[in-house]
Protein backbone atom coordinates (compact mmCIF):
# COMPACT_ATOMS: atom_id res chain seq x y z
CA UNK A 1 0.00 0.00 0.00
CA UNK A 2 2.93 2.37 0.69
CA UNK A 3 3.57 2.56 -3.06
CA UNK A 4 -0.01 3.36 -4.04
CA UNK A 5 -1.36 6.82 -4.81
CA UNK A 6 1.98 8.02 -6.17
CA UNK A 7 0.76 10.05 -9.16
CA UNK A 8 1.79 13.66 -8.67
CA UNK A 9 3.14 13.01 -5.18
CA UNK A 10 6.18 15.22 -5.78
CA UNK A 11 3.79 18.14 -6.34
CA UNK A 12 2.66 17.94 -2.70
CA UNK A 13 5.76 16.49 -1.00
CA UNK A 14 9.24 17.80 -1.73
CA UNK A 15 12.47 17.30 0.22
CA UNK A 16 15.98 18.72 0.32
CA UNK A 17 19.06 18.92 2.53
CA UNK A 18 19.04 22.01 4.74
CA UNK A 19 21.71 24.64 5.21
CA UNK A 20 23.03 25.53 8.68
CA UNK A 21 21.68 29.07 8.68
CA UNK A 22 20.06 30.51 11.81
CA UNK A 23 17.71 32.65 9.69
CA UNK A 24 13.92 32.55 10.08
CA UNK A 25 12.91 28.88 10.48
CA UNK A 26 9.99 29.46 8.07
CA UNK A 27 12.34 30.05 5.12
CA UNK A 28 13.19 27.11 2.81
CA UNK A 29 16.83 26.84 4.00
CA UNK A 30 18.21 25.33 0.81
CA UNK A 31 21.91 24.58 0.54
CA UNK A 32 23.91 26.18 -2.26
CA UNK A 33 23.75 24.53 -4.69
CA UNK A 34 20.34 23.08 -3.86
CA UNK A 35 20.31 19.37 -2.92
CA UNK A 36 16.87 17.89 -3.54
CA UNK A 37 16.03 14.40 -2.32
CA UNK A 38 13.78 11.88 -4.05
CA UNK A 39 10.85 10.50 -2.06
CA UNK A 40 12.49 7.05 -2.31
CA UNK A 41 15.25 8.34 -0.01
CA UNK A 42 12.59 9.34 2.51
CA UNK A 43 11.10 5.85 2.26
CA UNK A 44 14.54 4.38 3.05
CA UNK A 45 14.54 6.49 6.22
CA UNK A 46 11.14 5.08 7.18
CA UNK A 47 9.05 8.07 6.09
CA UNK A 48 5.90 7.01 4.22
CA UNK A 49 3.88 9.41 2.08
CA UNK A 50 0.87 9.61 -0.20
CA UNK A 51 -0.97 12.13 -2.33
CA UNK A 52 -4.71 12.19 -1.65
CA UNK A 53 -7.69 14.39 -2.52
CA UNK A 54 -8.11 16.90 0.34
CA UNK A 55 -11.20 18.53 -1.17
CA UNK A 56 -13.27 15.40 -0.56
CA UNK A 57 -11.48 13.81 2.38
CA UNK A 58 -14.71 12.84 4.15
CA UNK A 59 -15.55 10.44 1.29
CA UNK A 60 -12.01 9.55 0.14
CA UNK A 61 -11.79 5.78 -0.40
CA UNK A 62 -7.99 5.87 -0.50
CA UNK A 63 -7.87 7.54 2.91
CA UNK A 64 -10.29 4.95 4.28
CA UNK A 65 -8.10 2.14 2.93
CA UNK A 66 -4.96 3.63 4.48
CA UNK A 67 -6.70 4.08 7.84
CA UNK A 68 -8.00 0.51 7.84
CA UNK A 69 -4.69 -1.01 6.73
CA UNK A 70 -2.63 0.92 9.30
CA UNK A 71 -5.12 0.97 12.17
CA UNK A 72 -5.63 4.75 12.33
CA UNK A 73 -8.80 4.71 14.40
CA UNK A 74 -8.82 8.33 15.62
CA UNK A 75 -8.61 11.56 13.61
CA UNK A 76 -8.95 15.24 14.37
CA UNK A 77 -8.40 18.44 12.41
CA UNK A 78 -6.25 21.31 13.61
CA UNK A 79 -5.57 24.76 12.19
CA UNK A 80 -2.06 25.99 12.89
CA UNK A 81 -1.92 29.76 12.46
CA UNK A 82 -1.65 32.77 14.79
CA UNK A 83 -5.41 33.46 14.62
CA UNK A 84 -6.69 29.96 15.37
CA UNK A 85 -4.16 28.09 17.53
CA UNK A 86 -4.32 28.95 21.26
CA UNK A 87 -0.90 29.79 22.73
CA UNK A 88 0.43 29.97 19.17
CA UNK A 89 3.97 31.20 19.92
CA UNK A 90 4.53 28.64 22.67
CA UNK A 91 3.15 25.79 20.55
CA UNK A 92 5.23 26.72 17.49
CA UNK A 93 8.38 26.82 19.62
CA UNK A 94 7.62 23.38 21.05
CA UNK A 95 6.90 21.95 17.57
CA UNK A 96 10.31 23.20 16.38
CA UNK A 97 12.25 21.65 19.28
CA UNK A 98 13.96 18.52 17.99
CA UNK A 99 12.05 15.58 19.44
CA UNK A 100 10.76 12.08 18.86
CA UNK A 101 7.60 10.17 19.73
CA UNK A 102 7.09 6.58 20.81
CA UNK A 103 4.35 6.28 18.16
CA UNK A 104 4.14 7.30 14.52
CA UNK A 105 3.36 10.92 13.71
CA UNK A 106 0.77 11.04 10.92
CA UNK A 107 -0.28 14.28 9.26
CA UNK A 108 -2.48 14.93 6.23
CA UNK A 109 -2.39 18.48 4.84
CA UNK A 110 -5.92 19.62 3.94
CA UNK A 111 -5.02 23.27 3.32
CA UNK A 112 -1.90 25.43 3.48
CA UNK A 113 1.61 24.03 3.90
CA UNK A 114 4.45 23.48 6.34
CA UNK A 115 7.85 21.88 6.88
CA UNK A 116 8.80 18.68 8.67
CA UNK A 117 12.54 18.43 9.30
CA UNK A 118 13.97 14.93 9.84
CA UNK A 119 17.48 13.57 10.41
CA UNK A 120 19.13 11.25 7.90
CA UNK A 121 21.43 8.38 8.93
CA UNK A 122 24.36 10.84 9.11
CA UNK A 123 22.42 13.22 11.37
CA UNK A 124 21.98 15.79 8.57
CA UNK A 125 18.74 17.75 8.44
CA UNK A 126 16.33 17.02 5.59
CA UNK A 127 13.48 19.48 5.12
CA UNK A 128 10.21 17.99 3.86
CA UNK A 129 7.75 20.48 2.40
CA UNK A 130 4.20 19.22 2.90
CA UNK A 131 1.53 20.87 0.78
CA UNK A 132 -2.23 20.49 0.32
CA UNK A 133 -3.01 16.86 -0.50
CA UNK A 134 0.16 15.40 0.98
CA UNK A 135 -0.01 12.81 3.74
CA UNK A 136 3.09 11.83 5.67
CA UNK A 137 3.99 9.27 8.33
CA UNK A 138 7.10 9.78 10.45
CA UNK A 139 8.18 6.55 12.16
CA UNK A 140 8.28 6.19 15.93
CA UNK A 141 11.75 6.99 17.26
CA UNK A 142 12.75 9.40 14.47
CA UNK A 143 14.06 12.79 15.59
CA UNK A 144 12.16 15.57 13.84
CA UNK A 145 10.59 19.00 14.20
CA UNK A 146 7.85 21.03 12.50
CA UNK A 147 7.43 24.63 11.43
CA UNK A 148 5.09 26.61 9.26
CA UNK A 149 6.48 28.21 6.12
CA UNK A 150 6.19 31.93 5.35
CA UNK A 151 2.46 31.56 4.56
CA UNK A 152 1.91 30.89 8.29
CA UNK A 153 -0.97 28.44 7.83
CA UNK A 154 -1.66 24.75 7.69
CA UNK A 155 -4.90 22.86 8.23
CA UNK A 156 -3.91 19.31 9.05
CA UNK A 157 -5.60 16.07 9.90
CA UNK A 158 -3.89 14.25 12.75
CA UNK A 159 -4.30 10.48 12.74
CA UNK A 160 -3.65 8.10 15.63
CA UNK A 161 -3.74 4.41 16.43
CA UNK A 162 -6.05 4.38 19.44
CA UNK A 163 -6.09 7.33 21.83
CA UNK A 164 -4.80 10.69 20.52
CA UNK A 165 -1.53 10.90 22.45
CA UNK A 166 1.10 13.43 21.33
CA UNK A 167 4.01 13.24 23.75
CA UNK A 168 7.29 14.79 22.55
CA UNK A 169 10.60 13.55 23.95
CA UNK A 170 13.15 16.25 23.24
CA UNK A 171 16.60 15.17 22.12
CA UNK A 172 18.47 13.35 23.60
CA UNK A 173 16.19 10.39 24.35
CA UNK A 174 18.27 7.67 22.70
CA UNK A 175 17.54 5.22 25.53
CA UNK A 176 13.87 4.86 24.58
CA UNK A 177 12.92 1.50 23.00
CA UNK A 178 11.23 3.32 20.08
CA UNK A 179 14.53 5.07 19.27
CA UNK A 180 16.51 1.82 19.45
CA UNK A 181 14.00 0.03 17.22
CA UNK A 182 14.08 2.89 14.70
CA UNK A 183 17.90 2.80 14.52
CA UNK A 184 17.90 -0.99 14.15
CA UNK A 185 15.48 -0.77 11.20
CA UNK A 186 17.59 1.99 9.64
CA UNK A 187 20.77 -0.10 9.93
CA UNK A 188 19.00 -3.13 8.47
CA UNK A 189 17.71 -1.06 5.55
CA UNK A 190 21.19 0.38 4.93
CA UNK A 191 22.70 -3.12 4.97
CA UNK A 192 20.15 -4.42 2.48
CA UNK A 193 20.75 -1.47 0.14
CA UNK A 194 24.52 -1.95 0.28
CA UNK A 195 24.13 -5.66 -0.45
CA UNK A 196 22.09 -4.88 -3.56
CA UNK A 197 24.56 -2.23 -4.71
CA UNK A 198 27.50 -4.58 -4.10
CA UNK A 199 25.88 -7.42 -6.05
From Swiss-Prot:
GO BP term, pick one: L-methionine salvage from methylthioadenosine
Keywords in alphabetical order: Amino-acid biosynthesis, Cytoplasm, Dioxygenase, Iron, Metal-binding, Methionine biosynthesis, Nickel, Nucleus, Oxidoreductase
Induction per the UniProt record: By low levels of ethylene and submergence.
Transcription regulation keyword on record: no
Cofactor note: Binds either 1 Fe or Ni cation per monomer. Iron-binding promotes an acireductone dioxygenase reaction producing 2-keto-4-methylthiobutyrate, while nickel-binding promotes an acireductone dioxygenase reaction producing 3-(methylsulfanyl)propanoate.
GO molecular function, one term: nickel cation binding
Predominant localisation class: cytoplasm
Transmembrane regions listed in the UniProt entry: none
CDD domains found in the cross-reference section: cupin_ARD
Reactions catalysed according to its record: 1,2-dihydroxy-5-(methylsulfanyl)pent-1-en-3-one + O2 = 4-methylsulfanyl-2-oxobutanoate + formate + 2 H(+); 1,2-dihydroxy-5-(methylsulfanyl)pent-1-en-3-one + O2 = 3-(methylsulfanyl)propanoate + CO + formate + 2 H(+)
Enzyme superclass (EC): oxidoreductase
UniProt-annotated location(s): Cytoplasm; Nucleus
Keyword Repeat found: no
Pathway entry: Amino-acid biosynthesis; L-methionine biosynthesis via salvage pathway; L-methionine from S-methyl-5-thio-alpha-D-ribose 1-phosphate: step 5/6
Domain of life: Eukaryota
Residues binding Ni(2+), per UniProt: 99, 101, 105, 144
Record GO cellular component, one term: cytoplasm
Record-stated family: Belongs to the acireductone dioxygenase (ARD) family.
Classification via PANTHER family: ACIREDUCTONE DIOXYGENASE
Functional summary from the UniProt entry: Catalyzes 2 different reactions between oxygen and the acireductone 1,2-dihydroxy-3-keto-5-methylthiopentene (DHK-MTPene) depending upon the metal bound in the active site. Fe-containing acireductone dioxygenase (Fe-ARD) produces formate and 2-keto-4-methylthiobutyrate (KMTB), the alpha-ketoacid precursor of methionine in the methionine recycle pathway. Ni-containing acireductone dioxygenase (Ni-ARD) produces methylthiopropionate, carbon monoxide and formate, and does not lie on the methionine recycle pathway.
Cross-referenced HAMAP family: Salvage_MtnD_euk
Entry protein name: Acireductone dioxygenase 1
Organism for this UniProt entry: Oryza sativa subsp. indica (Rice)
Gene: ARD1
